[in-house]
Regions:
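Long, compositionally biased, intrinsically disordered regions
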Residues: 1-206
Length: 206
């Protein structure tokens, strides 16, 4: 339903306001527990079980891929009237890491540069997902239209420096003790999303 509404909204000849997005933010919990329950007292739309850090990174990449596909893969302009000069975000998932990620498999941090390298190594055809296209290409190419994680890193650093920010992805981590939102962003022309994607307007961010 969400993907269909995004496509229809982006292709509507009479403007985006006629067609409403039917997208809902999903609450996702990632756990290393063997049982069904994630955090006690909390309700989630889906629970993902992992055994180690490689599985965890792969599942995060799959979530990003599903979000990217759901919102039109950066090819569909679904922004409302009046937002064309701004970044317009759609929140796909609210991701919670169960305490077992730290306690059972000892993961306290996930390096963002390592995550980019996993995107480079993992192919779309090698994951189990009903929505991600079956293609013999890496997630890095799917997201950024490049084959080198170093190229993505360099582009991010350059974009940050142009905005007066010193960036070093070696020191950027996802920490399981925090919650994260997974979003896509429609960006105005000239943004870092366009630089990385060879012309696309969006980006999958966690």
């Amino acid at each position: 339903m969400c993907h269909t509404s995004v496509i229809l909204r982006g292709s509507a000849p009479v403007g985006t306001e006629i067609i409403k997005l039917t997208c809902k933010t999903e609450k996702v919990c990632i756990t290393a527990k063997k049982g069904e329950e994630c955090e006690k007292g909390a309700t989630y739309d889906s629970v993902i079980k992992v055994k180690d850090e490689e599985e965890l990174k792969k599942e995060l990449i799959i979530l990003m891929g599903e979000c990217w596909w759901m919102m039109g893969e950066g090819k569909v302009d679904y922004r409302s009237k009046g937002f064309y000069s701004y970044t317009y975000c759609g929140i796909c998932d609210l991701v919670t890491f169960d305490k077992s990620i730290q306690e059972n498999i000892g993961i306290s941090q996930i390096n963002y540069r390592d995550l980019l390298e996993s995107m480079e190594k993992t192919k779309l055809k090698d994951v189990d997902s009903e929505s991600i296209p079956y293609k013999d290409e890496s997630f890095l190419r799917y997201f950024f239209n490049v084959d080198s994680s170093q190229k993505v890193y360099d582009a991010l650093v350059k974009a940050a420096e142009e905005n007066g920010v010193t960036a070093n992805l070696n020191n950027v981590y996802l920490t399981p003790s925090q919650k994260y939102v997974l979003v896509t962003a429609m960006m105005k022309t000239g943004s870092w999303g366009e630089v990385l994607g060879g012309g696309y307007l969006g980006g999958a961010i966690i």
